């Protein structure tokens, strides 16, 4: 059975944000929202008209580290566990998706996700015509959305848009259960890791880190702090009840939908 996954080579990533932009175009992601993000660490400087840059790094060399992140399509996905209406689910091929007709906008999935990979449409989504070129239907107000591994492309035998449009070839996509697939060979050959693996989520996205710039390992606490920068996600976490390993694992069922006798 097919089990899709992704390898991101941080030694190749140049922080160009092409993955973020092509994702928005392909999936008609609303203005102000991003499914793909590239976090940046280091290299603080001021770009002045005189070109005066403060020194940084060893020998005065400015260094940058880039951490691409999106939905990790976890095998043990906490977002799937906490959804009270089963709107978030895992497909047979391992891709985690959302049924927008079922989504009630409770945002428990946002509270549960340790990667802050989901966004909520608080208002009626706005799109610029030049930004949306994909065939994916726009999501309505009041639902959560996120990366889908471009499942509409995958079903047609194509790679996700972020993979195809990465100018540095830093992304490798394929079947994790096929030992002969390129993505499986990368995982077997290189020293890969999963983000926040201590959470027990078992992501389907793997990262290659090196000791050389630009790719260098990020400490878990630093990464978790960077990921947790969305006010809606933090507010949802505060409303969560039972928390285990950093995310809510208790299914929340609205009283009006709960089963049982009156």
Swiss-Prot record:
InterPro entries, alphabetized = 4Fe4S_Fe-S-bd, 4Fe4S_Fe_S_CS, DsrO-like, ET_IronSulfur_Cluster-Binding
GO CC terms of this entry: plasma membrane
Q: Which UniProt keywords apply?
A: 4Fe-4S, Cell membrane, Electron transport, Iron, Iron-sulfur, Membrane, Metal-binding, Repeat, Transport
GO molecular function: any one? Answer: oxidoreductase activity
Q: Which cofactors, if any, are listed as required?
A: [4Fe-4S] cluster
* Location(s), subcellular: Cell membrane
Which Gene3D superfamilies does the record cross-reference, listed alphabetically? 3.30.70.20
Chain positions recorded as [4Fe-4S] cluster 2 binding sites: 23, 147, 150, 162
Region annotated Disordered sits at: 209-262
Sequence ranges assigned to domain 4Fe-4S ferredoxin-type in this UniProt record? 4-34, 62-93, 94-123
Cofactor info, note text: Binds 4 [4Fe-4S] clusters.
Q: SUPFAM superfamilies, alphabetically?
A: 4Fe-4S ferredoxins (SSF54862)
Where along this sequence does the record place binding of [4Fe-4S] cluster 4?
Answer: 83, 103, 106, 109
Zinc as UniProt keyword: no
**Residues that hold [4Fe-4S] cluster 3 according to the record:** 71, 74, 79, 113
Induction per the UniProt record: By anaerobic conditions. Its expression is under the control of DmsR.
Membrane disposition: Peripheral membrane protein
Residues where [4Fe-4S] cluster 1 binds: 13, 16, 19, 166
Protein purpose: Dimethyl sulfoxide (DMSO) reductase catalyzes the reduction of dimethyl sulfoxide (DMSO) to dimethyl sulfide (DMS) during anaerobic respiration; it can also use trimethylamine N-oxide (TMAO) as terminal electron acceptor. Subunit B is proposed to be involved in electron transfer.
What quaternary arrangement does the UniProt entry report?
Probable multiprotein complex that likely consists of DmsA, DmsB and DmsC.
Q: What is this protein called?
A: Putative dimethyl sulfoxide reductase iron-sulfur subunit B
Organism for this UniProt entry: Halobacterium salinarum (strain ATCC 700922 / JCM 11081 / NRC-1) (Halobacterium halobium)
